[in-house]
Amino acid sequence: MSVDYGVIYNRVDRFLQTREGLANPKKASDYKWFVRELSGIFCGAAYEHNLSTESVVNFLDIVQPHCINGIVNTGKVSSVCDLISDHIKHDPLYYILERTLMLYKPASVQVGPGEFFMCFYDAGSVFGIDNTAGYDVVVDGTTTELKSLGTNLTTPEIFDKYAANPILQRLMVVKPVSGAAKPQSRSVYACIDVDKWRDAFYHRNGRTLAYKEGIK
């Protein structure tokens, strides 16, 4: 099935204008690059799965007003898909692009897994594209720092610095769905108030970030 890149490009552009920080004027030189990348992702997914241009546009239409609510903030390992409304999850593009959007880094912006995904699916989000903001994203109305499970780029000392940051409210650690053809589990996360991070996370051997609660 043929895909109309121009139609998808224009719809992606309009979509991104609704997400604060993703069309940040400070990064204006990167913005068109960003739109091209994301348009290419959607065109590729549609082509590979025999979906129409209209299917992509309709998906963006239903995601644009969507808000993420009810993030579990107790440190419990929870399913990311529970944060997404059923009518979106019933669209094949949600699962087709789950891993891609979890790992996607807009243009030249340095972000970690989950940051773009959360802002994509939350109309009220703020993408902390400025590295002096003191947080990665605002999602579900709360300033949030995101990290990836298993990363070796954090330490207890770094997390303690996060806890001392008066702007930052909570810490979220995500494990994106695997790239397997039939993954055994979908993306998960654990989230907790940043000053209680030791109740939910630890650093194996002092560096490798892990959940205290096992993944079921």
What are these regions (language model features)?
Residues S2-G134, T142, L146-K216:
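Nucleic-acid endonuclease domains
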